[in-house]
């Protein structure tokens, strides 16, 4: 019985010493986040990036070519026998 009484005394002391008792665990109060203004950073100078421009398409100018004279060509007579000078079968 003495152990039961000492258990009750310890339980009562624990309940008195703990402000919330055995009801809930400690939960911190939720606070809204504190607004922090952004840190000012001076602008950093960056040199412009050099990008070569693609070449513009320009057609080459025409090259002058002197007129070409073809050698004369004798047309064979149509529907007739070849001339005597070209006939080698005679």
From Swiss-Prot:
GO (cellular component) term, any one: extracellular region
Domain of life of the organism encoding this protein: Eukaryota
Record's signal peptide: 1-24
Protein localization: Secreted, Cell wall
Pro residues: bias regions: 46-65
Region described as Disordered: 46-90
Sorted UniProt keywords: Cell wall, Developmental protein, Repeat, Secreted, Signal
Record family assignment: Belongs to the plant proline-rich protein superfamily. ENOD12 family.
Protein name in UniProt: Repetitive proline-rich cell wall protein 3
Gene behind this protein: PRP3
